[in-house]
Amino acid sequence: MGIAAYFYDPIFVEIAAKLGFRVLWIEMEHAFITFAQAADLCRIASGTGMLTMIRISDNRRENVLKAAECGPDIIDLPMADTVQIVHEFIQHARFRPEGARGYFSVPRALDYGMVESLPQAQQKLNAELSLMIQIETAEAVQRTDELCAIPGVDVFLGPADLSSSLGVPGQTTHSKVVEAAQTCVKAARRHGKLIAVGSPLPDVQFWADQGVDILFCGNDVACLRIGAQSILKQASAAIQNRKASTSA
């Protein structure tokens, strides 16, 4: 079970961990988190026992490389619509011979250089870092089997953007979206991929039934909004009850 951080707040991360969330999604596609903040969130989450996933904005080398140096467990690439996009992602994120990741001896991802053998540590990181490609367009769904056949990547499903791409924006349980999602899940399973998904609460049961490996079901902004709404509703009801009893 995972939850997303859309802004930098260590307190939220600790609360999420204590509540039992096991994976922290650090959002850098839509939100304004910096790489320095992302690295801090990785440190904090790791200290609480949570896994971390950074979603970058695109597969430009500087984005992939800086995210990788933060030391997350997962890097997620949105809009991974073509094999070429995915191969470029791998090239930037993996050390040779699997990719062409730039040499940097002291990142958090390599324990700041406190390793017996840097080449061995790089190969260990190659094996441990999960690269997720986000399937969230009709184009990507059509290429699902081809994309899932690429070695060294796992799959993240984006039902919200997928619904828009399929012409039914916001209708994440529409038959078109469900059919596409199930196609992706089957392809991912066939190729031995891990599957993650970001889901609104009403859809959680559907995704749980699909047997996804990581289910993100909330974010910090939504938690603040829902909590504030609940407090306001209860306080307003108390005030209304007081007025009613006074007038009586």
Residue ranges and their predicted role:
Residues 2, 22-23, 51-53, 73-76, ...:
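Structural preference for beta-strand elements that scaffold enzyme active sites
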Residues 27-29, 56, 77-80, 159, ...:
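Short beta->alpha connector loops at strand-helix junctions that form conserved
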